């Protein structure tokens, strides 16, 4: 901490700073200390190496499923929810510096921050979960809808598309995009109070962007009938999205879709959707596809999902 500004660095570069039990415990303890220090007004979160945070620790999930200890996964995720909720509701102004990859849980962590700075040509965001047999369980299905709207949440989570810095900014996942040389100045401007918090809830920042328009049209009402029925006469963009979706885990798609809808329906009480994410964990981690998909990540092999 220096001059009221706390700097937090996730330092597991060998694991791309993935969240595990130890990291969640450390973050919780550190955050409690910052909240209790009245001199702290800003916190800057960064990752060491090439990633901000590349999701949760996959081996932890596989080990717990194989040992029939899914309760431990739920407990870990509940603790993750607690600290992410604390960061989101904090009096402290928070800045996520996303100068590399932010995947899954890392993107979910960043979405709890007031400011999310990306670097042009370097920042890449993605929710890979439905492609590995699970769904974003640290608030991703809910905060994506709050930040970017239902259609962009479906594009990001259900289809699992990569988001470069410009698209992520147009959607709202990033609040600032700068060249690498301008990164420290952008951070300084926020610390000095020269940047207002963005406010465009439940819709993308730039709905007039050409790609955003396609996303709004493709992932609006009736998207399942269009994209999951190969005989429906799809255009090139829709056909690509359909291919992404049908290779993902069916139960993951179904549950993620339902959670995204809950986020849209419970705007007055976001806690409803966050609890729904937690309530579905036992179901999703008990599927054969979850173990298949998570093992596939560790082995580096593409897998086929059975829908079980």
Spans of features found by a protein language model:
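Glycine- (often His-adjacent) and acidic-residue-rich active-site loop
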Residues: 47-82, 102, 131-133, 305
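Conserved CoA-thioester-binding segment of acyl-CoA-metabolizing enzymes
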Residues: 1-48, 71, 85, 220, ...
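Amphipathic alpha-helical segments at domain termini/boundaries
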Residues: 1-11, 15, 158-277, 283, ...
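Terminal peptide-recognition signature
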Residues: 8, 12, 26-27, 45, ...
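Hydrophobic, secondary-structure "cap" segments at the distal end of domains
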Residues: 141-151
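Glycine-rich beta-to-alpha active-site loop
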Residues: 83-132, 136, 156-165
């Amino acid at each position: 901490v220096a001059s009221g500004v706390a700097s937090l660095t996730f330092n597991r570069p060998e694991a791309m700073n993935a969240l595990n039990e130890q990291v969640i415990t450390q973050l919780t303890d550190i955050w409690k200390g910052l909240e209790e220090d009245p001199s702290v007004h800003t916190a800057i979160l960064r990752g060491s190496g090439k990633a901000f945070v590349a999701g949760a620790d996959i081996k932890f999930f596989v080990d717990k499923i194989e040992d029939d200890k899914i309760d431990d996964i739920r407990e870990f995720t509940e603790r993750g929810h607690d600290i992410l909720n604390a960061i989101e509701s904090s009096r402290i102004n928070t800045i996520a510096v996303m100068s590399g990859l932010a995947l899954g849980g890392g993107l979910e962590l960043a979405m709890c921050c007031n400011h999310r700075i990306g670097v042009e040509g370097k920042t890449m965001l993605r929710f890979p979960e439905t492609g590995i047999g699970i769904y974003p369980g640290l608030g991703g299905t809910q905060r994506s809808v709050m930040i970017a709207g239902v259609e962009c949440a479906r594009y990001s989570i259900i289809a699992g598309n990569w988001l470069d810095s410009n698209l992520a900014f147009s959607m709202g996942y990033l609040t600032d995009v700068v060249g690498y040389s301008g990164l420290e100045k952008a951070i300084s401007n926020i610390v000095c109070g020269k940047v207002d918090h963005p406010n465009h809830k439940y819709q993308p920042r730039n709905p007039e962007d050409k790609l955003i328009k396609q996303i709004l049209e493709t992932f609006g009402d009736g998207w399942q009938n269009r994209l999951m029925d190969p005989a429906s006469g799809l255009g090139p963009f829709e056909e690509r999205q359909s291919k992404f979706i049908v290779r993902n885990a069916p139960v993951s798609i179904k549950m993620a879709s339902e959670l995204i809808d809950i986020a849209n329906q419970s705007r007055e009480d976001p806690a409803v959707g966050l609890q729904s994410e937690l309530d579905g964990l036992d179901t999703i981690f008990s599927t054969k596809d979850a173990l298949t998909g998570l093992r596939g990540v560790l082995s580096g092999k593409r897998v086929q999902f059975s829908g079980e």
